[in-house]
Amino acid sequence: MSLPHAVTTALQHQQHQKQLQESSSDAWTNKCVDYVERIIRFYRTNDMSHLTPQMIMLINTIRDLCVESHPISVNVVKRFDSDENLIKHYSRLRKELGGSEVAENIFQPSFVYNVLPSYAQKFYNKGAENVSGDSVSEAAHELGEALQYQIAEAVASNTPIPLPVRHQLVNTYITLLLQRANIPPNVQDAVSSRKYPTLNIINDLINNVIDDVFTGVYGNYYYYVLNEKNRARIVTLKENIGFLAPLSASTDIFQYIANLATRAGKRPSLFQGATFLNAPSSNGSNVEQNRTSCQQSLTELAFQNEALRRYIFQKLSYKQNY
């Protein structure tokens, strides 16, 4: 093979490789652009039919990362100064964007009567033996409203229906606690992850009650959750301790008992704080711990507001412009 021919072959091979790389790069770029267009279409039209489960999971991941790294500011500015202005805004949208009439009931009474007669009779028939027409109509209306809101919430939270996974998880957790049953590993992982706001509320409430009862940090506010027996026992306990020691020394019962034990000769253990044993080995979880409850509540309210906004837009049935 002559040198010029070898050089030509090498150049052709190099050019072919470059074309393949450009083609691959163009395909990847087109794929990214298409995906972005699908996301934009999803937010504009509430249509999830063109999204695969993997795409929905990626959208959820991006949303969670944004919420975790940039939670909603406590000093969030309201778009409307008053509820009246908000109502006027949606009234204007109804006039400008309102399309065809939307049926009030997405479930026809005949469907409820033929498929779910027991549902209408149990919850809407007021104890009567036979199902009445009014009960069927009311059941159809309530089911329609519930499903329409679930659709809006599903789109706002990027979670396809059925939604009640977290609600079932919360109910299971509460039932297990009340029955003093073994907590399954998956439920323990869900609690430890602190990704489920309602689970966090349950555990935070229990810990707040303990803090308030034994340290008075919340000014006895959580006495409301105690029954009469436990409330009387706690009040009596604090009165007895207050009788034995000055108020300033007995406010924190934990510290007061620890001081008494130390005076009696008990030596502090090496791992005195239980939090030391459970402390994470890295600082990765400190971001979640540093988020205030106000920021968490505002973030949750933002998603609820988005669900309500989409619910209202569903009611408008406006003409979509692409």
UniProtKB/Swiss-Prot annotation:
Family statement: Belongs to the baculoviridae gp41 family.
Entry keywords, A to Z: Glycoprotein, Late protein, Virion
Name of the protein in question: Structural glycoprotein p40
The keyword Methyltransferase belongs to this UniProt entry's keyword annotation: no
Stored Pfam families: Baculo_gp41
Molecular function terms, GO-annotated: structural molecule activity
Positions glycosylated per UniProt: 130, 283, 290
A cellular-component GO term for this protein: virion component
The organism's place on the tree of life at top rank: Viruses
Localization terms from the record: Virion
InterPro entries: Baculovirus_Gp41
Gene giving rise to this polypeptide: P40
UniProt keyword Protein biosynthesis, yes or no: no
